[in-house]
Structure formats: structure tokens, C-alpha cells
Curated annotation (Swiss-Prot):
This is one of the proteins that binds to the 5S RNA in the ribosome where it forms part of the central protuberance. Coiled coil: none annotated. GO terms for molecular function: 5S rRNA binding; structural constituent of ribosome. This is Large ribosomal subunit protein bL25.
Length: 190
């Protein structure tokens, strides 16, 4: 899915200026990237708030329009208000199509309900990590990774090597020879 966001350069900075922006329905943010100076920006709160609720937005390549120029960016960080449903600040990183990007991708459990551990042993599959750090070209970043649990039995521990990574995507930990546990299977052993 492609997301497009309109941004404007903000001149005034600081706490007071940020509060005024938020009252006007804008979010203060920053755009940075390799080979460019950081730019203080403002984006529409409603657009970003509802986009952040979608899991795919966090790993998507976003078209950010700034002063008539469109840049490819990814969301690098954002801050939420402690108790209001309000985005306080957002960071965008400009990316180039030919440069690798390091990003955390959500992990989904699939086929667990068909596994022996769940069907016959009354068990369940529990994620130890909800995301995996990967390196990929911006166009190859997946929205999420699937952890296939069709063949698991009670007592199994699933590792990074059990995840089928799409072509052009590499796990940062596996590149360092660290095959971390990502999920456990509980239930009654027979």
C-alpha cells in the first residue's frame, strides 16, 4: 500500500511553537537522511494519526510532498501523548531506492491453530519478540513476516532461522550469527 503525506516547512521551533501547531491540527516533525540537513516540518495530525493505526504504515515507503518536491521516506520514530489519543512528534527518514535500510518488521504467527501443539496438546504459541530487525532495499521491505507454526509440538522453541524471509531481505541478527528465539510453544507433552 502506498501512503502520501503533505508536509510544510516550519520556521518557528520550540515548545510554544509546537503547542500552537498541535492546536491547529498539525504535528511537528523532522525529516532527515543521508547527505541532507535535517528539516523541521509539520504534517496533518488526522492523516498521520489514522495512518499510524495501520500496521503496514510503520514499514511502508511513504511519498512525502514538501515544497512541491516528493521524497521517499519511512517512519523512523513517533511519540504519543501519555493519555490523550494524540501524536506529539514524528520523525521521517529520507531513503534512496538503491541504499539498504535497517528497519523493524512485525512478526505474525500463522497456522498455529492447525498444529499438533494447539489441536491435540491444548497448547499455544507465544511470541517472545513482536518484530524482527531486517536489512533491505526500500522497495523490498515487507509489511510483516510470517512465522509458520503448522508443524510445531509442545515444548518447541522457534528461532529466527525458522522465519521464511522474502527475497532481498536479511535478518540483522542472523547476519551476526545470532539465531535468537522468537516464539515458544506451550502445552502438555505426550
Amino acid at each position: 500500500m502506498t501512503y502520501e503525506i503533505q508536509a510544510s516547512v516550519r520556521e518557528a521551533q520550540g515548545t510554544g511553537a509546537s503547542r500552537r501547531l498541535r492546536r491547529e491540527g498539525q504535528i511537528p516533525g523532522i525529516l532527515y537522511g543521508e547527505g541532507q540537513e535535517p528539516v523541521a516540518i509539520a504534517v496533518d495530525h488526522k492523516t498521520v494519526f489514522y495512518a499510524l493505526e495501520k500496521e503496514s504504515f510503520h514499514t511502508a515507503l511513504i511519498k512525502l510532498s514538501l515544497n512541491g518536491e516528493t521524497k521517499d521516506v519511512i517512519v523512523r520514530d513517533f511519540q504519543m501523548h501519555p493519555f490523550r489519543r494524540e501524536v506529539q512528534h514524528i520523525d521521517f527518514q529520507a531513503v534512496k531506492a538503491d541504499q539498504l535500510v535497517r528497519i523493524r518488521v512485525p512478526l505474525h504467527i500463522v497456522n498455529a491453530e492447525n498444529s499438533q501443539a494447539v489441536k491435540l496438546q491444548g497448547g499455544r504459541v507465544s511470541l517472545l519478540n513482536t518484530s524482527v530487525e531486517v536489512v533491505a532495499l526500500p522497495a523490498n521491505i515487507p509489511a510483516f513476516l510470517d512465522l509458520d507454526c503448522a508443524e510445531v509440538v509442545a515444548g518447541d522453541i522457534l528461532h529466527l532461522s525458522d522465519i521464511k524471509l522474502p527475497e532481498g531481505v536479511e535478518s540483522v541478527s542472523l547476519k551476526r550469527n545470532e539465531n535468537l528465539a522468537v516464539a515458544t510453544v506451550t502445552g502438555k507433552k505426550r
